[in-house]
């Protein structure tokens, strides 16, 4: 099996501070990895670097994703190539409904692959099917993205995004952060 994600000699700085120093990691397609370490050891930094978040300087090393130089890609290109980051603290986006956010991301990926946008009825069927699996009520799809959601509702909503977008690589940063009792049901 070929390398799916290969990180070689990666060093990452935030301002003048080295957060990741000379990291090497090989992940083959289909493998599941848990990266563990104390606070400040670079777990979230690695997640953010893989997703292309600004504010990080790669001082050394390379990241190869499915045979392509990941470092040269913009965040939206990384997402369209199949990288998904579930945030430790999902952001609220007032004025944007949950369903519109997910459909926009879904259609953006379809456009990247040369496909037409999904028909609204087909998307509604898909999102309701996945929402039901996760126990997400229909009314939450019409609410503003993560606005007023509990920690568990936000995490469940990210799980819905993950199921709909079906990425090649899912990076789950602090998956238990902000969970409520209902999330454990």
Could you tell me what each predicted segment is?
Residues 5-7, 20-22:
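Conserved structural motif at the start of ABC-family nucleotide-binding domains
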Residues 33-35, 47:
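Short hydrophobic beta-strand immediately N-terminal to the Walker A/P-loop
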Residues 62-78, 146:
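ABC ATPase NBD Q-loop/coupling interface
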Residues 91-168:
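ABC-family P-loop ATPase nucleotide-binding domains
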